[in-house]
Amino acid sequence: MNTIASVTLPHHVHAPRYDRQQLQSRIVHFGFGAFHRAHQALLTDRVLNAQGGDWGICEISLFSGDQLMSQLRAQNHLYTVLEKGADGNQAIIVGAVHECLNAKLDSLAAIIEKFCEPQVAIVSLTITEKGYCIDPATGALDTSNPRIIHDLQTPEEPHSAPGILVEALKRRRERGLTPFTVLSCDNIPDNGHVVKNAVLGMAEKRSPELAGWIKEHVSFPGTMVDRIVPAATDESLAEISQHLGVNDPCAISCEPFIQWVVEDNFVAGRPAWEVAGVQMVNDVLPWEEMKLRMLNGSHSFLAYLGYLSGFAHISDCMQDRAFRHAARTLMLNEQAPTLQIKDVDLTQYADKLIARFANPALKHKTWQIAMDGSQKLPQRMLAGIRIHLGRETDWSLLALGVAGWMRYVSGVDDAGNAIDVRDPVSYTHLTLPTIR
Protein backbone atom coordinates (compact mmCIF):
# COMPACT_ATOMS: atom_id res chain seq x y z
CA MET A 1 0.00 0.00 0.00
CA ASN A 2 1.32 3.42 -0.95
CA THR A 3 2.05 5.90 1.86
CA ILE A 4 3.52 9.39 2.07
CA ALA A 5 6.87 7.69 2.72
CA SER A 6 6.79 5.57 -0.44
CA VAL A 7 5.57 7.94 -3.17
CA THR A 8 6.87 11.11 -4.80
CA LEU A 9 4.77 13.92 -3.41
CA PRO A 10 3.62 16.97 -5.42
CA HIS A 11 5.97 19.97 -5.54
CA HIS A 12 3.55 22.15 -3.56
CA VAL A 13 3.94 19.87 -0.52
CA HIS A 14 6.70 20.95 1.89
CA ALA A 15 8.80 17.91 2.84
CA PRO A 16 11.69 17.62 5.37
CA ARG A 17 14.94 19.12 4.07
CA TYR A 18 17.17 17.61 6.78
CA ASP A 19 18.81 14.23 7.28
CA ARG A 20 16.33 12.23 9.35
CA GLN A 21 18.98 9.54 9.89
CA GLN A 22 20.69 11.93 12.31
CA LEU A 23 17.67 12.08 14.63
CA GLN A 24 17.74 10.60 18.11
CA SER A 25 14.93 10.39 20.63
CA ARG A 26 16.05 13.49 22.53
CA ILE A 27 12.41 14.34 23.31
CA VAL A 28 9.91 11.79 24.59
CA HIS A 29 6.33 12.97 24.24
CA PHE A 30 3.22 11.73 26.06
CA GLY A 31 0.08 12.07 23.95
CA PHE A 32 0.31 11.88 20.14
CA GLY A 33 -2.92 13.83 19.68
CA ALA A 34 -4.02 16.31 17.06
CA PHE A 35 -2.73 19.39 18.86
CA HIS A 36 0.77 18.06 19.43
CA ARG A 37 1.07 17.00 15.79
CA ALA A 38 0.13 20.48 14.58
CA HIS A 39 2.04 22.42 17.24
CA GLN A 40 5.11 21.24 19.22
CA ALA A 41 6.17 18.55 16.74
CA LEU A 42 5.69 20.91 13.79
CA LEU A 43 7.74 23.68 15.45
CA THR A 44 10.52 21.19 16.23
CA ASP A 45 10.39 20.18 12.56
CA ARG A 46 10.84 23.84 11.58
CA VAL A 47 13.99 24.03 13.69
CA LEU A 48 15.36 20.91 12.01
CA ASN A 49 14.58 22.33 8.57
CA ALA A 50 16.41 25.54 9.51
CA GLN A 51 19.58 24.07 11.00
CA GLY A 52 19.44 20.27 11.15
CA GLY A 53 20.43 18.46 14.32
CA ASP A 54 19.42 15.36 16.26
CA TRP A 55 16.37 16.61 18.20
CA GLY A 56 14.00 13.79 17.27
CA ILE A 57 10.81 12.88 19.11
CA CYS A 58 9.66 9.52 20.45
CA GLU A 59 5.88 9.49 20.70
CA ILE A 60 4.30 7.61 23.61
CA SER A 61 0.73 6.41 24.10
CA LEU A 62 -0.30 4.11 26.90
CA PHE A 63 -3.60 2.25 26.68
CA SER A 64 -5.12 3.79 23.56
CA GLY A 65 -3.88 5.07 20.21
CA ASP A 66 -2.43 1.74 19.08
CA GLN A 67 -4.08 1.99 15.65
CA LEU A 68 -2.69 5.49 15.07
CA MET A 69 0.77 4.34 16.16
CA SER A 70 0.63 1.38 13.77
CA GLN A 71 -0.36 3.71 10.94
CA LEU A 72 2.47 6.10 11.84
CA ARG A 73 5.03 3.28 11.74
CA ALA A 74 3.73 2.15 8.35
CA GLN A 75 4.72 5.53 6.86
CA ASN A 76 8.15 5.82 8.50
CA HIS A 77 6.85 8.14 11.25
CA LEU A 78 5.95 10.86 8.75
CA TYR A 79 2.61 12.67 8.79
CA THR A 80 0.95 15.70 7.21
CA VAL A 81 -0.21 19.01 8.62
CA LEU A 82 -2.54 21.00 6.36
CA GLU A 83 -2.59 24.68 7.30
CA LYS A 84 -5.92 26.07 6.12
CA GLY A 85 -6.19 29.80 5.60
CA ALA A 86 -8.94 31.93 4.14
CA ASP A 87 -6.68 32.54 1.11
CA GLY A 88 -5.42 29.00 0.55
CA ASN A 89 -3.88 25.89 2.06
CA GLN A 90 -0.34 24.62 2.66
CA ALA A 91 0.53 20.95 3.17
CA ILE A 92 3.61 20.16 5.30
CA ILE A 93 5.19 16.75 5.88
CA VAL A 94 6.53 16.62 9.44
CA GLY A 95 9.63 14.47 9.91
CA ALA A 96 10.63 15.26 13.50
CA VAL A 97 9.11 12.06 14.90
CA HIS A 98 11.86 9.44 15.19
CA GLU A 99 9.96 6.54 16.73
CA CYS A 100 6.83 5.67 18.69
CA LEU A 101 5.86 3.27 21.47
CA ASN A 102 2.50 2.02 22.66
CA ALA A 103 1.76 -0.17 25.67
CA LYS A 104 -0.46 -2.49 23.60
CA LEU A 105 1.90 -2.77 20.61
CA ASP A 106 5.10 -2.88 22.65
CA SER A 107 5.05 -3.06 26.44
CA LEU A 108 4.84 -0.81 29.45
CA ALA A 109 8.35 -1.92 30.39
CA ALA A 110 9.69 -0.76 27.00
CA ILE A 111 8.04 2.62 27.46
CA ILE A 112 9.54 3.18 30.91
CA GLU A 113 12.98 2.14 29.68
CA LYS A 114 12.73 4.64 26.81
CA PHE A 115 12.56 7.45 29.39
CA CYS A 116 15.78 6.08 30.90
CA GLU A 117 17.92 6.28 27.76
CA PRO A 118 20.88 8.66 28.25
CA GLN A 119 20.09 10.95 25.31
CA VAL A 120 16.58 11.84 26.54
CA ALA A 121 16.66 15.52 27.58
CA ILE A 122 12.99 16.54 27.56
CA VAL A 123 9.77 14.73 28.40
CA SER A 124 6.83 16.74 27.06
CA LEU A 125 3.14 16.13 27.62
CA THR A 126 -0.24 16.84 26.02
CA ILE A 127 -2.48 14.63 28.14
CA THR A 128 -5.30 17.09 29.06
CA GLU A 129 -6.22 18.12 32.59
CA LYS A 130 -7.37 14.62 33.52
CA GLY A 131 -4.02 13.04 32.70
CA TYR A 132 -2.19 14.78 35.55
CA CYS A 133 -4.39 13.12 38.21
CA ILE A 134 -4.62 16.34 40.21
CA ASP A 135 -7.44 17.14 42.62
CA PRO A 136 -8.87 20.37 41.13
CA ALA A 137 -10.01 21.55 44.57
CA THR A 138 -6.55 21.38 46.17
CA GLY A 139 -4.08 21.30 43.27
CA ALA A 140 -2.42 18.28 44.89
CA LEU A 141 -2.08 14.72 43.61
CA ASP A 142 -5.45 12.95 43.73
CA THR A 143 -4.65 9.87 45.79
CA SER A 144 -8.20 8.59 45.26
CA ASN A 145 -7.65 8.32 41.49
CA PRO A 146 -7.69 4.60 40.53
CA ARG A 147 -4.48 4.90 38.50
CA ILE A 148 -2.66 6.64 41.34
CA ILE A 149 -3.85 3.96 43.76
CA HIS A 150 -2.51 1.32 41.35
CA ASP A 151 0.83 3.12 40.95
CA LEU A 152 1.39 3.45 44.68
CA GLN A 153 0.71 -0.27 45.12
CA THR A 154 2.82 -1.39 42.11
CA PRO A 155 5.24 1.52 41.51
CA GLU A 156 7.46 -0.37 39.07
CA GLU A 157 4.51 -0.96 36.71
CA PRO A 158 2.84 2.47 36.70
CA HIS A 159 -0.26 3.31 34.65
CA SER A 160 -0.40 7.09 35.15
CA ALA A 161 1.76 9.87 33.74
CA PRO A 162 2.94 10.96 37.23
CA GLY A 163 3.73 7.36 38.12
CA ILE A 164 5.73 6.77 34.94
CA LEU A 165 7.67 10.02 35.29
CA VAL A 166 8.62 9.27 38.91
CA GLU A 167 9.65 5.69 38.14
CA ALA A 168 11.75 6.87 35.18
CA LEU A 169 13.46 9.59 37.24
CA LYS A 170 14.10 7.09 40.03
CA ARG A 171 15.85 4.73 37.60
CA ARG A 172 17.88 7.55 36.03
CA ARG A 173 19.06 8.61 39.47
CA GLU A 174 20.03 5.06 40.39
CA ARG A 175 21.96 4.68 37.11
CA GLY A 176 23.82 7.96 37.48
CA LEU A 177 22.09 9.57 34.49
CA THR A 178 21.24 13.25 34.26
CA PRO A 179 17.55 14.08 34.79
CA PHE A 180 15.31 15.43 32.06
CA THR A 181 13.12 18.51 31.83
CA VAL A 182 9.38 17.87 32.23
CA LEU A 183 7.52 20.15 29.81
CA SER A 184 3.73 20.37 29.99
CA CYS A 185 2.25 21.67 26.74
CA ASP A 186 -1.39 21.36 27.79
CA ASN A 187 -3.74 24.31 27.62
CA ILE A 188 -4.22 24.59 31.37
CA PRO A 189 -3.27 27.41 33.74
CA ASP A 190 0.15 27.27 35.34
CA ASN A 191 0.82 23.97 33.59
CA GLY A 192 4.42 23.78 34.80
CA HIS A 193 3.31 23.86 38.43
CA VAL A 194 0.48 21.39 37.73
CA VAL A 195 2.84 18.71 36.44
CA LYS A 196 5.40 19.56 39.14
CA ASN A 197 2.77 19.06 41.87
CA ALA A 198 1.74 15.76 40.32
CA VAL A 199 5.30 14.44 40.06
CA LEU A 200 6.44 15.63 43.49
CA GLY A 201 3.21 14.40 45.05
CA MET A 202 3.81 10.92 43.66
CA ALA A 203 7.51 10.99 44.60
CA GLU A 204 6.75 12.04 48.19
CA LYS A 205 4.45 9.04 48.56
CA ARG A 206 7.24 6.75 47.36
CA SER A 207 10.37 8.31 48.87
CA PRO A 208 10.89 11.76 50.40
CA GLU A 209 14.57 11.45 49.46
CA LEU A 210 13.66 10.87 45.80
CA ALA A 211 11.24 13.79 45.94
CA GLY A 212 14.02 16.03 47.24
CA TRP A 213 16.33 14.98 44.40
CA ILE A 214 13.64 15.68 41.81
CA LYS A 215 12.87 19.06 43.34
CA GLU A 216 16.55 20.03 43.18
CA HIS A 217 17.51 18.63 39.78
CA VAL A 218 14.41 18.54 37.54
CA SER A 219 12.83 21.61 35.94
CA PHE A 220 9.16 22.06 35.05
CA PRO A 221 8.91 25.07 32.69
CA GLY A 222 5.56 26.71 32.09
CA THR A 223 4.24 27.10 28.54
CA MET A 224 1.46 28.86 26.66
CA VAL A 225 0.25 27.16 23.50
CA ASP A 226 -2.03 28.58 20.82
CA ARG A 227 -3.29 27.11 17.59
CA ILE A 228 -6.79 26.11 16.53
CA VAL A 229 -6.63 22.41 15.63
CA PRO A 230 -10.00 20.74 14.99
CA ALA A 231 -10.24 16.98 15.45
CA ALA A 232 -9.65 14.98 12.27
CA THR A 233 -12.75 13.90 10.36
CA ASP A 234 -13.35 11.74 7.30
CA GLU A 235 -13.92 14.98 5.39
CA SER A 236 -10.64 16.60 6.51
CA LEU A 237 -8.62 13.44 5.82
CA ALA A 238 -10.16 13.16 2.33
CA GLU A 239 -9.22 16.79 1.62
CA ILE A 240 -5.62 16.16 2.68
CA SER A 241 -5.47 13.04 0.50
CA GLN A 242 -6.43 15.19 -2.48
CA HIS A 243 -3.51 17.53 -1.75
CA LEU A 244 -1.05 14.66 -1.44
CA GLY A 245 -2.30 12.18 -4.01
CA VAL A 246 -2.10 9.48 -1.33
CA ASN A 247 -3.88 8.73 1.95
CA ASP A 248 -2.39 9.80 5.28
CA PRO A 249 -4.42 8.46 8.23
CA CYS A 250 -2.21 10.42 10.67
CA ALA A 251 -2.80 13.79 9.02
CA ILE A 252 -4.36 16.79 10.71
CA SER A 253 -5.73 20.18 9.59
CA CYS A 254 -5.30 23.46 11.44
CA GLU A 255 -5.27 27.23 11.07
CA PRO A 256 -2.13 29.06 9.82
CA PHE A 257 -1.64 30.96 13.12
CA ILE A 258 0.67 29.39 15.68
CA GLN A 259 2.14 30.67 18.96
CA TRP A 260 4.21 29.04 21.67
CA VAL A 261 5.53 30.91 24.72
CA VAL A 262 7.97 28.88 26.83
CA GLU A 263 9.70 29.56 30.14
CA ASP A 264 13.39 29.15 29.32
CA ASN A 265 14.34 26.77 32.13
CA PHE A 266 15.79 23.47 30.83
CA VAL A 267 18.18 21.24 32.77
CA ALA A 268 19.54 19.19 29.85
CA GLY A 269 19.35 21.41 26.79
CA ARG A 270 16.60 22.06 24.25
CA PRO A 271 16.09 22.65 20.53
CA ALA A 272 16.65 26.21 19.30
CA TRP A 273 12.89 26.73 19.16
CA GLU A 274 13.32 30.49 18.86
CA VAL A 275 14.50 29.82 15.29
CA ALA A 276 10.93 28.68 14.60
CA GLY A 277 9.40 31.78 16.19
CA VAL A 278 8.87 30.40 19.69
CA GLN A 279 8.97 33.08 22.40
CA MET A 280 11.41 32.01 25.14
CA VAL A 281 10.61 34.10 28.24
CA ASN A 282 11.20 34.31 31.98
CA ASP A 283 7.51 34.44 32.95
CA VAL A 284 4.72 32.75 30.98
CA LEU A 285 1.84 33.69 33.29
CA PRO A 286 0.77 37.02 31.67
CA TRP A 287 0.66 35.38 28.24
CA GLU A 288 -1.19 32.38 29.62
CA GLU A 289 -3.89 34.48 31.28
CA MET A 290 -4.38 36.56 28.13
CA LYS A 291 -4.89 33.49 25.99
CA LEU A 292 -7.03 31.52 28.44
CA ARG A 293 -9.44 34.38 29.11
CA MET A 294 -9.62 36.20 25.78
CA LEU A 295 -9.28 33.29 23.34
CA ASN A 296 -10.40 30.22 25.26
CA GLY A 297 -13.03 32.05 27.30
CA SER A 298 -14.70 33.45 24.18
CA HIS A 299 -14.30 30.06 22.46
CA SER A 300 -16.26 28.39 25.27
CA PHE A 301 -18.81 31.22 25.21
CA LEU A 302 -19.38 30.62 21.49
CA ALA A 303 -19.33 26.84 21.88
CA TYR A 304 -22.15 26.57 24.43
CA LEU A 305 -24.36 29.38 23.19
CA GLY A 306 -23.61 28.59 19.56
CA TYR A 307 -24.44 24.91 19.94
CA LEU A 308 -27.69 25.76 21.71
CA SER A 309 -28.51 28.16 18.87
CA GLY A 310 -28.02 25.47 16.25
CA PHE A 311 -24.54 26.42 15.00
CA ALA A 312 -22.33 23.41 14.25
CA HIS A 313 -19.05 25.32 13.87
CA ILE A 314 -17.40 28.38 15.42
CA SER A 315 -17.15 29.99 11.98
CA ASP A 316 -20.94 29.62 11.67
CA CYS A 317 -21.35 31.60 14.91
CA MET A 318 -19.17 34.36 13.51
CA GLN A 319 -21.49 34.81 10.53
CA ASP A 320 -24.13 35.97 13.03
CA ARG A 321 -23.62 39.66 13.83
CA ALA A 322 -24.96 39.29 17.37
CA PHE A 323 -22.55 36.47 18.21
CA ARG A 324 -19.62 38.28 16.60
CA HIS A 325 -20.35 41.47 18.55
CA ALA A 326 -20.88 39.58 21.81
CA ALA A 327 -17.60 37.68 21.49
CA ARG A 328 -15.58 40.85 20.83
CA THR A 329 -17.35 42.72 23.64
CA LEU A 330 -16.66 39.85 26.04
CA MET A 331 -12.97 39.95 25.16
CA LEU A 332 -12.45 43.70 25.45
CA ASN A 333 -14.98 44.81 28.08
CA GLU A 334 -14.94 41.90 30.51
CA GLN A 335 -11.78 39.82 29.98
CA ALA A 336 -9.13 42.35 28.96
CA PRO A 337 -9.60 44.51 32.12
CA THR A 338 -8.69 41.50 34.29
CA LEU A 339 -5.26 41.04 32.66
CA GLN A 340 -1.85 42.37 33.72
CA ILE A 341 0.12 41.80 30.51
CA LYS A 342 2.27 44.68 29.26
CA ASP A 343 3.28 45.86 25.78
CA VAL A 344 0.44 44.00 24.03
CA ASP A 345 -2.31 45.81 22.10
CA LEU A 346 -5.34 43.88 23.40
CA THR A 347 -7.73 45.50 20.91
CA GLN A 348 -5.52 44.30 18.06
CA TYR A 349 -5.27 40.87 19.72
CA ALA A 350 -9.07 40.65 20.00
CA ASP A 351 -9.53 41.62 16.35
CA LYS A 352 -7.07 38.91 15.29
CA LEU A 353 -8.99 36.38 17.37
CA ILE A 354 -12.26 37.34 15.72
CA ALA A 355 -10.64 36.90 12.29
CA ARG A 356 -9.28 33.49 13.31
CA PHE A 357 -12.66 32.35 14.62
CA ALA A 358 -14.29 33.44 11.35
CA ASN A 359 -11.92 31.38 9.17
CA PRO A 360 -14.36 29.47 6.91
CA ALA A 361 -11.73 26.88 5.99
CA LEU A 362 -11.70 25.49 9.54
CA LYS A 363 -14.58 23.31 10.63
CA HIS A 364 -14.08 23.58 14.40
CA LYS A 365 -17.16 22.05 15.97
CA THR A 366 -18.91 23.80 18.82
CA TRP A 367 -19.61 20.35 20.29
CA GLN A 368 -15.89 19.53 20.38
CA ILE A 369 -14.97 22.77 22.17
CA ALA A 370 -17.82 22.24 24.63
CA MET A 371 -16.23 19.06 26.02
CA ASP A 372 -14.92 18.97 29.61
CA GLY A 373 -16.36 22.37 30.50
CA SER A 374 -16.34 21.68 34.23
CA GLN A 375 -12.54 21.56 34.07
CA LYS A 376 -12.12 24.44 31.61
CA LEU A 377 -14.49 27.15 32.85
CA PRO A 378 -12.66 27.93 36.12
CA GLN A 379 -9.67 29.38 34.27
CA ARG A 380 -11.55 30.59 31.20
CA MET A 381 -14.45 32.42 32.86
CA LEU A 382 -14.62 32.03 36.63
CA ALA A 383 -11.19 33.62 37.19
CA GLY A 384 -12.40 36.77 35.46
CA ILE A 385 -15.71 36.72 37.32
CA ARG A 386 -13.85 36.57 40.65
CA ILE A 387 -11.93 39.74 39.75
CA HIS A 388 -15.10 41.56 38.66
CA LEU A 389 -16.83 40.61 41.91
CA GLY A 390 -13.97 42.15 43.86
CA ARG A 391 -14.14 45.33 41.80
CA GLU A 392 -17.94 45.42 41.54
CA THR A 393 -17.67 45.80 37.76
CA ASP A 394 -19.88 44.36 35.01
CA TRP A 395 -19.57 40.70 34.02
CA SER A 396 -22.94 40.08 32.37
CA LEU A 397 -21.51 38.31 29.29
CA LEU A 398 -19.40 36.03 31.47
CA ALA A 399 -22.59 35.21 33.37
CA LEU A 400 -24.30 34.44 30.06
CA GLY A 401 -21.46 32.09 29.12
CA VAL A 402 -21.75 30.19 32.40
CA ALA A 403 -25.52 30.01 31.95
CA GLY A 404 -24.95 28.56 28.48
CA TRP A 405 -22.75 25.86 29.99
CA MET A 406 -25.41 25.08 32.62
CA ARG A 407 -28.04 24.63 29.94
CA TYR A 408 -25.69 22.56 27.78
CA VAL A 409 -24.68 20.08 30.51
CA SER A 410 -28.32 19.53 31.42
CA GLY A 411 -28.25 17.21 28.40
CA VAL A 412 -31.33 18.58 26.65
CA ASP A 413 -31.63 21.69 24.49
CA ASP A 414 -34.59 24.08 24.38
CA ALA A 415 -36.21 22.05 21.59
CA GLY A 416 -36.11 18.91 23.70
CA ASN A 417 -33.28 17.30 21.74
CA ALA A 418 -30.70 15.23 23.61
CA ILE A 419 -27.16 16.65 23.86
CA ASP A 420 -24.20 14.25 23.85
CA VAL A 421 -22.46 15.77 26.88
CA ARG A 422 -18.80 14.82 27.38
CA ASP A 423 -17.77 16.13 30.78
CA PRO A 424 -16.15 14.51 33.86
CA VAL A 425 -18.84 16.17 35.97
CA SER A 426 -22.22 15.06 34.65
CA TYR A 427 -25.21 17.25 35.25
CA THR A 428 -27.57 15.30 33.03
CA HIS A 429 -29.70 14.46 36.08
CA LEU A 430 -30.65 18.12 36.39
CA THR A 431 -33.89 19.35 34.90
CA LEU A 432 -33.75 23.00 33.94
CA PRO A 433 -36.98 24.85 33.23
CA THR A 434 -37.82 25.76 29.67
CA ILE A 435 -38.30 29.50 29.29
CA ARG A 436 -41.29 30.32 27.14
Describe each PLM feature range.
Residues 2-430, 436:
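Substrate/ligand-engaging "lid" and interaction regions
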